[in-house]
Amino acid sequence: MVGSDGDGDGGGGEAHAPAAPAHHHRRPPRPRGGSGAIVEGFAAALRRRIRSGAAAAARASFGGDSGDEAASGEPSSSSSSSPSRRRGGDSNGAEASSAAGGGGGRGGGGDFSAFTFRAAAPVHRKAKESPLSSDAIFKQSHAGLFNLCIVVLVAVNSRLIIENLMKYGLLIRAGFWFNDKSLRDWPLLMCCLSLPAFPLGAFAVEKLAFNNVITDAVATCLHIFLSTTEIVYPVLVILKCDSAVLSGFLLIFIACIVWLKLVSFAHTNHDIRQLTMGGKKVDNELSTVDMDNLQPPTLGNLIYFMMAPTLCYQPSYPRTSCVRKGWLIRQIILYLIFTGLQGFIIEQYINPIVVNSQHPLKGGLLNAVETVLKLSLPNVYLWLCMFYAFFHLWLSILAEILRFGDREFYKDWWNAKTIDEYWRKWNMPVHKWVVRHIYFPCMRNGISKEVAVLISFLVSAVLHEICVAVPCRILKFWAFLGIMLQIPLIVLTAYLKSKFRDTMVGNMIFWFFFCIYGQPMCLLLYYHDVMNRIEKAR
């Protein structure tokens, strides 16, 4: 078992040396005879190590190809010590391969290397599919290709940004956001500051109702009057004043949020009264509801609800133990960065494309398709930045300041396989409000599921149209139609999901209609309609 390179030390020492396993490499004895012998000895040891490593690699390669666990799972010395696990099958074959290999078992793997590197060794051992064939493509890991796509995406977009800056320069203008017209928007600011009067009025109505001063019917009528006035009042102010589009959008957006909160406040307290007051109390319903959430409203609860990042009222919310100041500062910095990035995308890419485009319904078809596709890429980036800045950063900032515990503001909507799944995941505050105050009440009143979904989308479409049409001061129903057309897409993607199980066809349809076609088309339509209105006014 001891190698012949150690003969210079004498046979006596080797005769009594214990036999070492073939797969363990011992340091070769120091040869005698000067520096030349030393170099020759170490060269021989190096050759043995290289031959052993090559044999092990070959064994792993051939074992993986053939599916032979014995060939791929153990070193060659182990296989040579057990005839039943050796490819040759007997000791004669091992001796022959050892002799042919020149080093027979020394360093482990001599017998296998002699067999592996012979021309007679079989290479094709079983039928196998190509990794990208239809039968094997989903069994492979494509992480490397995904990384390649990320690298290509970063490289291509970096080149486009550099090319755009070299050709057009930096197009950011302060006048695009704030101009002399913005200084005349003080009526909108005063209107915004007066909106808290409506929640205070709703609180007074609930106090009267809980004290049995007014009936439930009167309280309901007063809530309807307050909520309707709250949404009509900002609309009239925006239409009366010649305000900037951005200022009008901010006001009507805040007004819609307050309206949703008022509806939730009135509906929830009405339900609490039904459960806790008079003979309408139902024991089995109370047993399933936390009693802490069945208390009359207080002014502190109302103020917290109006500021909290939620649209659904309840007397108490899960709270965190403290405010993480360092984390909060980092989130604020990120929010400012992504807000600035949105402004850069709008002014550097979207605004020039829209200004130099034609009305999509009046120009040629190819021209409209080219403009929509040109606008789709910056629109996707803008939409993703908007989502991250608002739903992840801004709502988390509010939640951290108020120690609001439930921070599930969105789910993994980007993996949605149907349009219905997307709407249930991308905007959780609105989704919870719709389910709680529209969908389930419709179901409890005997309305079918399909009609309840239609009513939910109808309310959403009206609110979207108000948020866009009022600041632009045009009524074209583009936003309304964009939301209502989601219903046939829901049916289509649900059918595709049932027909092609566990596929991403519905996900591709979602990305196409939302980011490639839908949003750029709506943006072009509203921009040109606003420009036409301004030209007619002049």
Swiss-Prot record:
It is found in: Endoplasmic reticulum membrane. It catalyses: an acyl-CoA + a 1,2-diacyl-sn-glycerol = a triacyl-sn-glycerol + CoA. GO terms for cellular component: chloroplast envelope; endoplasmic reticulum membrane. Residues 1-39, 54-106 are annotated as: Disordered. GO terms for molecular function: diacylglycerol O-acyltransferase activity. Pathway: Glycerolipid metabolism; triacylglycerol biosynthesis. GO terms for biological process: glycerol metabolic process; triglyceride biosynthetic process. It holds the Pfam family MBOAT. Keywords: Acyltransferase, Endoplasmic reticulum, Glycerol metabolism, Lipid biosynthesis, Lipid metabolism, Membrane, Transferase, Transmembrane, Transmembrane helix. It is a multi-pass membrane protein. It is an enzyme of class 2 (transferase). The active site is at 464. Residues 69-83 have a biased composition (Low complexity). Its EC number is 2.3.1.20. Its main location: endoplasmic reticulum. PANTHER family: DIACYLGLYCEROL O-ACYLTRANSFERASE 1-1, STEROL O-ACYLTRANSFERASE. Involved in triacylglycerol (TAG) synthesis. Catalyzes the acylation of the sn-3 hydroxy group of sn-1,2-diacylglycerol using acyl-CoA. Belongs to the membrane-bound acyltransferase family. Sterol o-acyltransferase subfamily. This is Diacylglycerol O-acyltransferase 1-1. It comes from Oryza sativa subsp. japonica.
